[in-house]
Curated annotation (Swiss-Prot):
Main location: cytoplasm
Cross-referenced CDD domains: NTP-PPase_HisIE_like
Protein's UniProt name: Phosphoribosyl-ATP pyrophosphatase
Gene for this chain: hisE
Entry GO terms, CC: cytoplasm
Length: 111
């Protein structure tokens, strides 16, 4: 796993027990999962809009910025649910080299 993701995972874990006024992440944890999910949704929309703007202008600066926000808030969400970024990387590794169609077909069917 990248050093950046490892360091960030450590910080996110440490913030779980911190006072809400000590950091942005601690305040998110204190507000609860619904607030964290709201932020993930907000950052998802902002990333989509930045991608549309980048496609039109060729300037990807805002897209990179918004994607970083989305990844960050997704990592906060995972940490809030007791998951480590390595679990996502492991899943990506598992999928590497698989056809997207084959991977999707192998998933359990929703009812």
């Amino acid at each position: 796993m990248s050093d950046t993701l490892s360091r960030l995972a450590e910080v996110l874990e440490a913030r779980k027990g911190a006072a809400p006024d000590s950091s942005y992440v601690a305040s998110l944890y204190h507000k609860g999962l619904n607030k964290i999910l709201e932020k993930v949704g907000e950052e998802s929309v902002e990333t989509i809009l930045a991608a549309k703007d980048a496609a039109a202008s060729g300037d990807c600066k805002d897209l990179i910025y918004e994607t970083a926000d989305l990844w960050f808030h997704s990592l906060v969400m995972l940490a809030a649910l007791g998951q480590h970024p390595q679990a996502v990387l492991d899943e990506l590794d598992r999928r590497f080299g698989l056809s997207g169609h084959a991977e999707k077909a192998a998933r359990p069917q929703s009812e």
